[in-house]
Amino acid sequence: MFGSNISVGNFPTFISAPDDYIQITSWDTGDWNGKVDIGNYVLISPGVRIMAADSVSIGDSCMFGHGASITDADWHGIYDRTKVVGDPRPVVLEENVWIGEDAMICKGVKIGANSIIGARSVVTKDIPKNTIYAGNPAVFIRDLDENEFITREDFFQDPAKLAKDFDLLDRYTLGQNSFLGWIKSMIFRDKSH
């Protein structure tokens, strides 16, 4: 995280890795007072990049796939390449938005509640609520029934079930690990990293 105007709500889930970190930047120097507001129950996967020279607002229960990117600026002028930031415009994601893997959300965009942006899509215009958009540029795919959603907030409402689900996930993820495997990994280190 870089910048002082970054706020994160309750119960966030940030998943990162040494070679695929999350980057959240509020450009709040000089003429710019960028801010990033992240709501409650938000899921941010490895490689996600959120950059604000003006404002990026992320509603409750939003999810970001691996490598998704949001920016509210061009970061340089079109003709004057020495001009930092360019012409920033706020980005707003309403509640329960799902941004697919490697999708890019550009400046000035508002994405309505419950909408889904497909993997590797490029969004340059507002997206209505309860819809799926995908492609480059992103185009309408279909409507969604607003009464069918179970959100990340719902997921966190039963702590006992949540603990059990995470325990099952850990067991599945780590199921092939063993003490002998760990010893081998310490002796015969993988030199490709």
Predicted features by range, described:
Residues 1-71, 94-95, 113, 129, ...:
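Domain-scale signature associated with acetyltransferase and cell-envelope carbohydrate enzymes
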Residues 31, 83-96:
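Glycine-rich NAD(P)-binding loop of Rossmann-like domains
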Residues 49-53, 102-115, 121-124:
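Beta-rich strand-turn-strand
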Residues 74-75, 81-83, 127, 143-144:
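Conserved catalytic-core motifs of eukaryotic protein kinase domains, centered on the activation segment
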Residues 77-84, 149-154:
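Short glycine/proline- and charge-enriched loop/turn segments
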Residues 90-91, 109, 130:
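A short, glycine- and basic residue-enriched loop/turn
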